[in-house]
């Protein structure tokens, strides 16, 4: 999961780096990306994409997958629809016994007691949580995340320019 559709160069660079890292670990890995622009995502990253708003396709892809990676970039938990959507994805993965990894995400300020509780519940059901800054770490601890949270650098800092340029 990530916000890969609006041609945001930072998010696209993060996605590129995550894809390259995964392919270094397993060159035969089959990666699918949730996107609103399937052709653009394929052209830029050479991976198949599924419409993030097509719940049926997402469920089918999650059922076929080993894991869901919630990818880098700032995650905005200000809108109820986003929180509910993420809760649905995490719950679906749990029901299907799929591993969930939040990788190098940034977590913005979460306000409101109910939003904090829902986000804490969601993050406490994620298998591995890796954030890209100490603010995000502190925010997750503040809202009640009991799971281990690791801090890493933003993946874009290790971005390597390749033949398919995003810049």
Predicted feature locations:
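A nucleotide-sugar donor-handling region in carbohydrate enzymes
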Residues: 113-167
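Aromatic- and Gly/Pro-rich donor/ligand-binding loops
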Residues: 1-111, 121, 156-157, 162, ...
């Amino acid at each position: 999961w990530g916000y890969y559709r609006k041609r945001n160069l930072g998010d696209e660079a993060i996605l590129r780096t995550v894809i390259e890292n995964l392919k270094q670990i397993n060159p035969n890995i089959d990666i699918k990306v949730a996107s609103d622009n399937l052709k653009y995502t394929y052209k830029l990253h050479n991976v198949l994409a599924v419409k993030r708003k097509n719940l049926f396709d997402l469920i089918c892809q999650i059922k076929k997958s080993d894991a869901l990676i919630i990818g880098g970039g700032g995650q905005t938990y200000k809108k109820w629809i986003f929180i509910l959507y993420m809760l649905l994805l995490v719950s679906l993965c749990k029901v299907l016994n799929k591993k969930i990894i939040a990788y190098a995400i940034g977590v913005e300020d979460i306000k409101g007691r109910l939003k904090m509780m829902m986000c804490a519940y969601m993050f406490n059901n994620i298998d591995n949580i890796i954030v890209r800054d100490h603010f995000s770490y502190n925010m997750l601890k503040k809202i009640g995340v009991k799971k281990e949270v690791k801090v890493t650098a933003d993946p874009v800092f290790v971005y390597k320019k390749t033949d398919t340029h995003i810049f």
